[in-house]
UniProtKB/Swiss-Prot annotation:
HAMAP family: TsaD (MF_01445). Signal peptide: none annotated. Substrate binds at V131, A132, S133, G134, G135, D164, G177, N264. Its main location: cytoplasm. This is tRNA N6-adenosine threonylcarbamoyltransferase. Required for the formation of a threonylcarbamoyl group on adenosine at position 37 (t(6)A37) in tRNAs that read codons beginning with adenine. Is involved in the transfer of the threonylcarbamoyl moiety of threonylcarbamoyl-AMP (TC-AMP) to the N6 group of A37, together with TsaE and TsaB. TsaD likely plays a direct catalytic role in this reaction. InterPro entries: ATPase_NBD, Gcp-like_dom, KAE1/TsaD, Peptidase_M22_CS, TsaD. SUPFAM superfamilies: Actin-like ATPase domain. Its EC number is 2.3.1.234.
Amino acid sequence: MWVLGIDTSCDDTGVGLVRDGKVVVNLVASQVRLHEAFGGVVPELASREHLKALPLLVERALAEAGLRPKDLDLVAATRGPGLIGALLVGYTFAKGMAFALDRPFYAVHHLEGHIAAAWPEGLPPPFLALVASGGHTHLYEVLDLGRYRLLGATRDDAAGEAFDKVARLLGLGFPGGPEVERLAEEAEEAIPFPVPLRGQEGYDFSFSGLKTKALHLVEKGLPKAALAKGFQEAAIAHLAEVVLKAAKDTGHRVLLVAGGVAANRALQERFKEAGLEVHFPPRGLSQDNGAMIALAAWRRHQRGFPPSPLSLGATAYWPLEEA
């Protein structure tokens, strides 16, 4: 069974092909250079770039797999959450393909896609899933496919957003995560940062205080590499402490870490040392992509979830618990 997945939820145009649960093609057209001059994503520009890139990317994906459109069995796309203009480009394109080919269409939640990318075939729920990216920092208890309980979320900035903002303060490129990580590796010592929300009763996250601390340190002219290292260490410690508290309280010993921040090597090492069974997405599936959307749709189809009606619209706001 061949599944085409499309993701245009933000600034990456993602097209993926999955065959019987295995990723065969995963193509991403990045808009980094376009948005770098603005220090962040400009929604209207993102939508226009998706319009230009998507048809060519779908054509290329099919060619790489040696397929014709009629060889597809399912078509899927991200319905939300995300930038509504960007979402509509991929979502309407996918619905149009499904209609023209008379194939089932699956409207996929963006965060379920990220979880699917890190979820090894055969791993039974329940378990914990941390989704940390430029737009989201959420901790879920995964009870089953399509059944999620939100344990905690960021109160302000997302983890990846904080990395981007600190990178901008340091005069680094966009996206900021890889740039901050690279600079932090150059430092022998870290400037200490306070770890947010220590002692809280729940499982929420907060990164705005770390961003403010970084601003004050930059204004003092302190070494940038040591600053980057201190910020990264505090951000990772915060993520780890909240997740480990949730693991202790719920009794879960299995954790998925998904989203763009999951590619951070220091974060991966921290979680591997935590004594949990930890799973990360394969290389290339941490960032937004279409293959994870195809994976999520394939699993839903295999479990007997009905296709989505073509009348269902895209949405910028969509809690995963309602997916």
